[in-house]
Amino acid sequence: MKRVVLTGTGSGVGKTTIATGIMKALSDEHKIQPFKVGPDYIDPSYHNCATGVSSRNLDSFFMSDGQIRQSFKNGMTSSHADYGIIEGVRGLYEGISPTNDIGSTSSIAKALNSPVILIINSRSLVRSAAAMTLGFKALDSRIDIEGVILNNVKSQKHYLKTKEAVEKLANTRVLGGIERDNSISMEQRHLGLIPAVEQERISGLVEKWGELIRENIDLDALMEIMDNSNPIINEYEPIWSPNKTKHKTRIAVPFDEAFNFYYKENLEALEYNNAKIEYFSPIHDEQLPSVDALYIGGGYPEIFKKELSKNTTMLESIKEFSQDNHPIYAECGGLMYLCKTIDSLPMVDVFPYHSMLTKRVQGLSYTIAHVQRDNPILKKNTTYHGHEFHYSKVEYTGSNSNDFAFSMRRGVGITGKYDGLLKNNTLASYIHTHTACLPDFGYNFTQSAYENK
């Protein structure tokens, strides 16, 4: 399977612009399967726009090496891709530890035995770009850095000087350089880039990135690197449990401006377990569709709180669904939506607490949670991994730890100690999870949906 990892020396070097531009440029003549390293919903939305193919996340905190390879294989096979292009996260070696590579781009490159392209912010650099390249190559001999892309060069003259330095002093070929251009930058929000689903101009912007890549990057050289990818180790592990619910169920999944943070494989795990996904909009539709369960992902409900609050028939239908004991699982933005209010505006009110946006980040971490109560997705006395990233908080005014399904071993959750409000058969948590670290997610949730029809 032909592939490449596009990584950077750090955050803010232009990985998403360059990776998405490469995906767009190559998609004109080839089938591209995009991937993103780490727990990220926003960058993949740009990949989807560029390729017309759902991007998948690869993460060594969530996944074993065998699961990383399986997820990569699943993506390449399902899309019949010619090339797999993997956008890294932060710097090549950044993970959860200063001394190992768990959660890093380098761990993904090694699990997939993939060639790597290093993106360098070349502003005011010439020979130092060569030094950076040498350092990144020297830190781990198992990382195969096959090329460099120079971003933010001042001029053609600057590019040629820096290219010569990297190729002669670091013995690494330079595939091209991108000059500084503020017109190609993306709008930011508190969780990062604005999701592509919201931006009407995104298709034009992605097209511009593709043109920029066609004009400045040696795509033939890049494809040659991918064509010569070394074999992937033939050791795979399943992403979800082979146990399968025999009964057919229908599961509602909101997907609109407010809610659009979902991992592709979570939805596939539900479908594997005979669930039919019914997509709907809490903003635009009048009520919940006729279903057996509800899965509310994250997103930006705080940005669309007025629209959500005005849709009273939808709010009432979801509250009644919870009161009727049908299973609901909600993550982050879904948790806020199920609270009494968001920034004082009425919401579903399954949980009698107020949620609000804050100026400072409240939770930004991989998480480890211990399950203290049975719930629609997990059984008591198990432990699972996830992640949280939120500039919001829920003002929990209760005093009973039994209100929560999870006690936190790593991360903040709702109270700093607990997460996962549980009422009726409704679970709402700040933790986002991936089926790779929760292999029974699809089975448990669909089984609960069937048992509580």
Swiss-Prot record:
<feature type="domain" description="GATase cobBQ-type">
    <location>
        <begin position="250"/>
        <end position="440"/>
    </location>
</feature>
<keyword id="KW-0484">Methanogenesis</keyword>
<keyword id="KW-0436">Ligase</keyword>
<keyword id="KW-0315">Glutamine amidotransferase</keyword>
<dbReference type="Pfam" id="PF07685">
    <property type="entry name" value="GATase_3"/>
</dbReference>
<comment type="similarity">
    <text>Belongs to the CobB/CbiA family.</text>
</comment>
<dbReference type="GO" id="GO:0005524">
    <property type="term" value="F:ATP binding"/>
</dbReference>
<comment type="pathway">
    <text>Cofactor biosynthesis; adenosylcobalamin biosynthesis; cob(II)yrinate a,c-diamide from sirohydrochlorin (anaerobic route): step 10/10.</text>
</comment>
<dbReference type="InterPro" id="IPR004484">
    <property type="entry name" value="CbiA/CobB_synth"/>
</dbReference>
<feature type="site" description="Increases nucleophilicity of active site Cys">
    <location>
        <position position="432"/>
    </location>
</feature>
<keyword id="KW-0169">Cobalamin biosynthesis</keyword>
<protein>
    <recommendedName>
        <fullName>Cobyrinate a,c-diamide synthase</fullName>
        <ecNumber>6.3.5.11</ecNumber>
        <ecNumber>6.3.5.12</ecNumber>
    </recommendedName>
</protein>
<comment type="function">
    <text>Catalyzes the ATP-dependent amidation of the two carboxylate groups at positions a and c of cobyrinate, using either L-glutamine or ammonia as the nitrogen source. Involved in the biosynthesis of the unique nickel-containing tetrapyrrole coenzyme F430, the prosthetic group of methyl-coenzyme M reductase (MCR), which plays a key role in methanogenesis and anaerobic methane oxidation. Catalyzes the ATP-dependent amidation of the two carboxylate groups at positions a and c of Ni-sirohydrochlorin, using L-glutamine or ammonia as the nitrogen source.</text>
</comment>
<keyword id="KW-0460">Magnesium</keyword>
<dbReference type="InterPro" id="IPR002586">
    <property type="entry name" value="CobQ/CobB/MinD/ParA_Nub-bd_dom"/>
</dbReference>
<dbReference type="GO" id="GO:0015948">
    <property type="term" value="P:methanogenesis"/>
</dbReference>
<keyword id="KW-0067">ATP-binding</keyword>
<dbReference type="GO" id="GO:0009236">
    <property type="term" value="P:cobalamin biosynthetic process"/>
</dbReference>
<dbReference type="Pfam" id="PF01656">
    <property type="entry name" value="CbiA"/>
</dbReference>
<keyword id="KW-0547">Nucleotide-binding</keyword>
<dbReference type="GO" id="GO:0042242">
    <property type="term" value="F:cobyrinic acid a,c-diamide synthase activity"/>
</dbReference>
<dbReference type="InterPro" id="IPR011698">
    <property type="entry name" value="GATase_3"/>
</dbReference>
<dbReference type="InterPro" id="IPR029062">
    <property type="entry name" value="Class_I_gatase-like"/>
</dbReference>
<feature type="active site" description="Nucleophile">
    <location>
        <position position="332"/>
    </location>
</feature>
<dbReference type="InterPro" id="IPR027417">
    <property type="entry name" value="P-loop_NTPase"/>
</dbReference>
